[in-house]
Amino acid sequence: PRKVAELDPDRFYMHGSPYEANWGRPESWKIADSHNWGIWYGQKPFESLDTEIPRFMSEFGFQAFPEMKTIATFASPEDYALESEVMNAHQKATIGNFLIKKTMGLYYKVPEDFDQLVYMGLVLQGVGVRQGLEAHRRNRPYCMGTLYWQLNDSWPVVSWSSIDYYGNWKALHYQAKRAFAPVLVDAIKEGEDLNIYVMSDKLEADKEVTLGLRVM
């Protein structure tokens, strides 16, 4: 920092990313960028993302297995079990499989069949990360951006990616596409109220907008 100040005193300098804390410290959400691993290492529910809003989210995420077609490239049917030797070799987060099942149990019935477990894990990852993406967009201009961890993989593996090693989109990538759409309509229950948010990243305002609401 001293050298930057000496050579280019008008240049803004940020000493690191994240600016203060990796996750779990509310004071770190007030300045610069933040990493929030509460829904992973902190084992918090996805709803925590609705209130833990940083100025800029530069990293957060949740794991999922790749689809069965990708798993079949490195495992045989006899290896299709969550804690098989082959599956553990392709899971580099120490308690990753435990966290996937634990969080899945908060929202869905945990399937016994491995292929169904993989499928529901993909759904879970997509829904959870999308919840964070939409929360960050809703809180603009306080929060002016969000990046999720991570885009893709360097080998076929259980990971936080939204695209697997072979280029197959996980459910998360489709959910991220929807969450980052130029115009997003988001309904969220806040207390006793159901609030509707309409967010637009268009450079020009739409002259006419119609919102239709159907109660079922």
Model-derived segments and their meaning:
Residues P1-H15, W23-W29, R214-M216:
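Repeat-solenoid scaffold signature
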Residues V4-A5, H15, G24, H35-A205:
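Substrate-binding clefts and catalytic carboxylate motifs of secreted carbohydrate-active enzymes
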Residues L203-M216:
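Short acidic, flexible loop segments centered on an aromatic residue
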